[in-house]
From Swiss-Prot:
This is Signal peptide, CUB and EGF-like domain-containing protein 2. Pfam families: cEGF, CUB, EGF_3, EGF_CA, Ephrin_rec_like, FXa_inhibition. Residues 43-83, 84-125, 126-162, 175-211, 215-250, 284-319, 321-361, 362-400, 401-441 form the EGF-like domain. It comes from the Eukaryota. GO terms for molecular function: calcium ion binding; hedgehog family protein binding; identical protein binding; lipid binding. The lineage of its organism: Eukaryota, Metazoa, Chordata, Craniata, Vertebrata. SMART domains: CUB (SM00042), EGF (SM00181), EGF_CA (SM00179), Ephrin_rec_like (SM01411). InterPro entries: cEGF, CUB_dom, EGF-like_Ca-bd_dom, EGF-like_dom, EGF-type_Asp/Asn_hydroxyl_site, EGF_Ca-bd_CS, EGF_dom, Growth_fac_rcpt_cys_sf. Residues 845-854 are annotated as: Interaction with the cholesterol-anchor of SHH. The CUB domain is important for the interaction with the cholesterol-anchor of SHH. The CUB domain regulates protease recruitment and activation during SHH shedding. Residues 807-919 form the CUB domain. Keywords: Calcium, Developmental protein, Disulfide bond, EGF-like domain, Glycoprotein, Lipid-binding, Repeat, Secreted, Signal. Disulfide bonds join C47-C60, C54-C69, C71-C82, C88-C100, C96-C109, C111-C124, C130-C141, C137-C150, C325-C336, C332-C345, C347-C360, C366-C376, C372-C385, C387-C399, C405-C416, C412-C425, C427-C440, C807-C833, C860-C881.
Length: 997
């Protein structure tokens, strides 16, 4: 059985008709009361019992012995036969000044394009198109009777579309030259000449340049009637009006009435007779009593009244619209637009109208899907997207990896390596990275004295095997000009997890049981790095992947060599080999201890073991946090930058003076490079090394990057802090002064404009290559576009010119969307995207185009088309090459859709994001009834619904899966949609489900 309302069984239809017809049939079948047959006969009301033979368009009036038929107002005849009266078929055209449309029993006046019907329902008034969106004109909009004209500012001329303006060219005779002389449209002709054309409704003058207005455009500028003559349009007025002195508009003549009355009556008695005669003639049954709206017959004649939103005029018959917006803005929060009989409130962009249809509420765009790639910050009426460190915002909402190495080599002195979300500096062989992570320091050999070890490994015999403790200290500064020995070991722990828990045994507790002579390993290191990675996931039941049951730990050690270790019999190379051999033995011991689960860590004074399972504190439900995490509102939160996790206090604390920490989730703070100079250090909670204080400022340098500092010499500059050298301007260029901080301080031979960089070899400005841009003057580099974006051309000046060429969208069986490349930024040139929507069986496609932005000045070089197949002859559902900010919804004319978007190398625009839904084809009639109803788009409030991503998602969810309707309560529905929208849908659905009610 089909969906209710889409078809009923024949038996059900018959039953329904029977129920509808049964009461009148039974009433007609009841015999008259026999008790009344002997009495006096009573009049039979033939009209009430349906025994008359009056025409369907006639009124039946009962009389004492019979009945009388009379045709309804608007019809003519003797009552048994009535035919429609054509009120338009007279010399007055029904009183209409433009077109008169006859309808059964009545008539209606309509106006030409560019006019609107006056409140009297007969006259036509000019519509000022310039009031809304400047008439679509780019520069100047001038209203004229029946139409409007776009004009351009000085130095521009009107393009062929008669709306946009193009800058004039001073060179050559062409359509780009201001002297082409065409009144309207200029077309390039062979041999370098031009040809003039006119807009529709105009004719080309004899001089083949000027354009003459005709009655076909804006009614020739006439308010009422227009007639074409050799001199142009000639205006005239309806008989009840006279022509104004301007020769175009019409004024109502004084004393003009539609009824024929004697104008020379002089006596009061004659006047009274006329009034009485007119009162007797006036009735609501004839021409609605002359009332505009509601008519009621009273003892003194007809009484006219007006519906809500109108006020009765002094003539007692005409209803005039009330402009509610004139009083307290109609109660609207933002905008009020008067309509005939009512008004509409609307909101500023970024706000939505609440269900009271007056109040405006900020739209929280950050609560919607796909608003921003990374972070979203909501503001009243708008929002801002932000990117994580190491990423750059492009196209308003997207984040792409920043190539830091493209600008001054990332600040690296030697090698810059870009990574996703970051970068790192590296040094050539024979150099080591300075503490500032940018400069490189030459390796000179080894220091004369040993440094305090930062890491110690202590292993001892315990229970027949080795037990190892790895202790990591903090507060030690690493030197960078020594020879080091590096080694590493990887071992596996079964049933392990990459998390730590408090150790049950500490080195202090073990020491009494491990005399010094029983120590198998006792080594110190300057650096250690531990990494943990889980093993492979194992397939489990039902094809699911179980969590790995093992983990792998890799420990990297770095040990420095010292002068005292070198002897006459063992040089530096010999010392390194001995050290490597000793370390390999130590690592074998460590590996055996780890396999026996006797490997322990001490980090920042906290003793830890590798955890088998996520541990919990005994007697508590609070989860034990991982390393570098503290509790915050019963949740484990990583300690933020500028703090570290203290194991003894079991909480995050601020880095003390003389230390810093620029990462989250750490168990120690790094020492500042000059801990002895505590007086110059910043207060606690230092986020990075630059907070340590005493650093050389931009334009300065020193051997270690700390004070005392020197100014950069002439011909050099330095934009960073804490550097050991300055950058050369190159090409022998001097600087304007000592202590220069940027290349812009270098005295170049020419200043390069944005989109260019200065080449210090040729001393010329070079255009930025594709994929780069430069927004500033006088730079010696171009910035790489973020992520996978590139530019349409070289010489780009702004990040907005970096565009992602990937075609956007997500295609699903039930819902999805298509999106122009780089949306919501401008799409790139020469794009070509193709999508195919192929819904499941017995489903159809509904598409909503909230808005689309395509440049109309490109002669349809950019377009979006939706067809059944790629063939240009296949059934086309939608095609456009223009901008439409008014939304539209439509169903596909074919069961599947082939969609293509193409752009040329000309102008670009924002493009589109078009959602779609597939629905059960049993609802086809209902969906088409809704989307084809003009009321869906009549008000701005309804239009905003089709632009609201949250509301469209809810509507599509129910259309795709009707059972999901029950996810939304009635209260939620009322809060989501305006009442007028709900009423529209309710009437459609009710008629669809109960067509026979």
């Amino acid at each position: 059985m089909g969906v209710a309302g889409c078809g009923r069984p024949r038996e059900a239809r018959a039953l329904l008709l029977l129920l509808l017809l049964l009461p009148p049939l039974l009433a007609a079948a009841v015999p008259p009361d026999r008790g009344l047959t002997n009495g006096p006969s009573e009049d039979v009301d033939e009209c009430a019992q349906g025994l008359d033979d009056c025409h369907a368009d006639a009124l039946c009036q009962n009389t004492p012995t019979s009945y009388k038929c009379s045709c309804k107002p608007g019809y003519q005849g003797e009552g048994r036969q009535c035919e429609d009266m054509d009120e338009c078929d007279n010399t007055l055209n029904g009183g209409c000044v433009h077109d008169c449309l006859n309808i059964p029993g009545n008539y209606r006046c309509t106006c030409f394009d560019g006019f609107m019907l006056a409140h009297d329902g007969h006259n036509c008034l000019d519509m000022d198109e310039c009031l809304e969106n400047n008439g679509g004109c780019q520069h100047i909009c001038t209203n004229v009777i029946g139409s409007y004209e776009c004009r351009c500012k000085e130095g521009f001329f009107l393009s062929d579309n008669q709306h946009t303006c193009i800058h004039r060219s001073e060179e050559g005779l062409s359509c780009m030259n201001k002297d082409h002389g065409c009144g309207h449209i200029c077309k390039e002709a062979p041999r370098g000449s031009v040809a003039c054309e006119c807009r529709p409704g105009f004719e080309l003058a004899k001089n083949q340049k000027d354009c003459i207005l005709t009655c076909n455009h804006g009614n020739g500028g006439c308010q009422h009637s227009c007639e074409d003559t050799a001199e142009g349009p000639e205006c005239s007025c309806h008989p009840r009006y006279r022509l104004h002195a301007d020769g175009r508009s019409c004024l109502e003549q004084e004393g003009t009435v539609l009824e024929g009355t004697e104008s020379n009556a002089t006596s009061v008695a004659d006047g009274d007779k006329r009034v009485k005669r007119r009162l007797l003639m006036e009735t609501c049954a004839v021409n609605n009593g002359g009332c505009d709206r509601t008519c009621k017959d009273t003892s003194t004649g007809v009484h006219c009244s007006c519906p809500t939103g109108f006020t009765l005029q002094v003539d007692g018959k005409t209803c005039k619209d009330i402009d509610e917006c004139q009083t307290r803005n109609g109660g609207c929060n933002h905008f009020c637009k008067n309509t005939v009989g009512s008004f509409d409130c609307s909101c500023k962009k970024g706000f939505k109208l609440l269900t009271d249809e007056k109040s405006c509420q900020d739209v929280d765009e950050c609560s919607l899907e796909r608003t921003c790639d990374h972070s979203c910050i909501n503001h009243p009426g708008t929002f801002i997207c932000a990117c994580n460190p190491g990423y750059t915002l492009y196209s308003f909402t997207h984040c792409g990896d920043t190539n830091e190495c493209s600008v001054n080599n990332g600040g690296c002195q030697q090698v810059c390596i870009n990574t996703v979300g970051s970068y790192e500096c590296q040094c050539h062989p024979g150099f080591k990275l300075h503490w500032n992570k940018k400069d490189c320091v030459e390796v000179k050999g080894f220091p004369p004295t040993s440094m305090t070890p930062r890491v110690s490994l202590h292993c001892g015999k315990s229970g027949g095997g080795d037990r190892c403790f790895l202790r990591c200290r903090s507060g030690i500064h690493l030197s960078s000009d020594v020879v080091t020995v590096r080694t590493s070991v990887t071992f596996k722990l079964n049933e392990g997890k990459c998390s730590l828990q408090k150790a049950k045994l500490s080195p202090e507790g073990l020491r009494p049981a491990l005399p010094e002579r029983h120590s198998s390993v006792k080594e110190s290191f300057q650096y250690a790095n531990l990494t943990c990675s889980p093993g492979k996931q194992v397939p489990g039941a039902l094809g699911r992947l179980n969590a790995p049951k093992e983990m792998f730990i890799t420990v990297e050690f770095e040990r420095e060599t010292y002068e005292k270790e070198v002897t006459a019999s063992c040089n530096l190379s010999c010392v390194v080999k001995r050290t490597e051999k000793r370390l390999r033995k130590a690592l074998r011991t460590l590996k055996r201890a780890a396999h026996r689960e006797q490997f322990h860590l001490q980090l920042s004074g906290m003793d830890l073991d590798m955890a088998k399972t996520p541990s919990r504190v005994s007697g508590q439900h609070e989860e034990t946090c991982g390393v570098g995490q503290g509790h915050e509102e019963s949740q484990c939160v990583s300690c933020r930058a500028g703090t570290y996790y203290d194991g003894s206090q079991e909480r995050c604390i601020l880095c003390p003076n003389g230390t810093f920490q620029n990462e989250e989730g750490q168990v120690t703070c790094e020492p500042c490079p000059r801990p002895e100079n505590l007086g110059s250090l910043k207060i606690s909670e230092a986020w990075n090394v630059s907070d340590c204080g005493g650093l050389c400022q931009p334009g300065e340098y020193s051997a270690n990057g700390f004070a005392p500092c020197q100014l950069c010499a002439l011909g050099t500059f330095q934009p960073d802090v804490g550097r050991t050298s300055c950058l050369s301007c190159g090409g022998g260029l001097p600087t304007k002064h000592l202590g220069a901080t940027s290349f812009q301080d270098c005295e170049t031979r020419v200043q390069c404009s944005p989109g260019h960089f200065y080449n210090t070899t040729t001393h010329r400005c070079i255009r930025c290559p594709l994929g780069t841009y430069q927004p500033e003057f006088g730079k010696n580099n171009c910035v790489s576009c973020p992520g996978n974006t590139t530019t349409d051309f070289d010489g780009s000046t702004n990040i907005t010119q970096c565009k992602n060429r990937k075609c956007g969208g997500e295609l699903g069986d039930f819902t999805g969307y298509i999106e122009s490349p780089n949306y919501p930024g401008n799409y790139p040139a020469n794009s070509e995207c193709t999508w195919t929507i192929n819904p499941p069986p017995k489903r159809r496609i509904l598409i909503v185009v909230p808005e689309i932005f395509l440049p109309i000045e490109d002669d349809c070089g950019d377009y979006l088309v939706m067809r059944k197949t790629s063939s240009s002859n296949s059934v086309t559902t939608y095609e456009t090459c223009q901008t439409y900010e008014r939304p539209i919804a439509f169903t596909s004319r074919s069961k599947k859709l082939w969609i293509q978007f193409k752009s040329n190398e000309g102008n670009s625009a924002r493009g589109f994001q078009v959602p779609y839904v597939t629905y059960d084809e049993d609802y086809q009639e209902l969906i088409e009834d809704i989307v084809r109803d003009g009321r869906l788009y009549a008000s701005e409030n309804h239009q905003e619904i089709l632009k609201d991503k949250k509301l469209i998602k809810a509507l599509f969810d129910v259309l795709a899966h009707p059972q999901n309707y029950f996810k939304y309560t009635a209260q939620e529905s009322r809060e989501m949609f305006p009442r007028s929208f709900i009423r529209l849908l309710r009437s459609k659905v009710s008629r669809f489900l109960r067509p026979y009610k």
